[in-house]
Amino acid sequence: MTPEVARRMNRLNESFYRDNARSFDQTRQTAWPGWERCLCIGHTTGALPRYGGVRVLDVASGNLRLARYLAERLPGVRVSYHGIDSCPMLARGVRLPEGWDVTLQDLDVVGTLLDKKLEEDLGAPGGDLGVPLEGGAADLVACFGFFHHVPTTEARRRLLQELLSYTRTGGLCCVSLWRPMSDRRIAKRARESTRAGLRSLGLSEKELDKGDYLLGWQGRLDTWRYCHHFDEEEIDWLVRAAQGTAELTARFCADGKAGDLNSYLVLTRS
């Protein structure tokens, strides 16, 4: 995928969430089963205390449903929560516990990654997203339902490194990687919508990378979003990319009717 097409895919997604924020929010209200397993791992390893204080960085926080889930599951914990998203309207009206220290940052993460990668030689990761975390690195860095919106393998690698750079030593970095082609119904729809999307946008299939798709929304053919399917080979590659910075604590599939719609990586910062 060329830099120009990658930027276009990001603009496509930015427009999609801006134009469909209300209807999208209505379909994203419940927690995912995979989150519970991540939380259990955090308790078991001691990375997440059941009492006291914990710092959380939520990248692609959307309508704050992860924050709401944590509020229910960690009632005795003082949480310092920093959420990042480029569609702030999704979080409007959401109330979190009064005892929490909450900051929300409006940031186009994908655009930042693409611009940095294409225009600068960044060298080693070290917080290039410019996240102003209070009190240092986070105990839990979570990025759920977002990696599949990041075009190019290199940008996805950089995102994982960025997430780890904001994770404290011994803390957890938890990410989900979408696997839509594991569901026959979703896979069929993805292939059909991609063909329609390419025609609508005047693009050819060769301009996308392996595993890239264009999805519509609620039967409409005038709005598109870029998505990527993660196969086992690419997930293996991401795990290797984290070596030297973090240890793989868990890797599992969860979510969806068959329990395999997302692949999760739980990484402990070295």
Model-derived regions, located:
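Local beta-strand N-terminus motif with an aromatic residue
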Residues: 53, 137-138
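Conserved S-adenosyl-L-methionine
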Residues: 60
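A conserved beta-strand element that flanks and buttresses the S-adenosyl-L-methionine
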Residues: 142
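Short catalytic micro-motifs in class I SAM-dependent methyltransferases
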Residues: 145-149
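A short, conserved alpha-helix within the catalytic core of class I
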Residues: 150-162
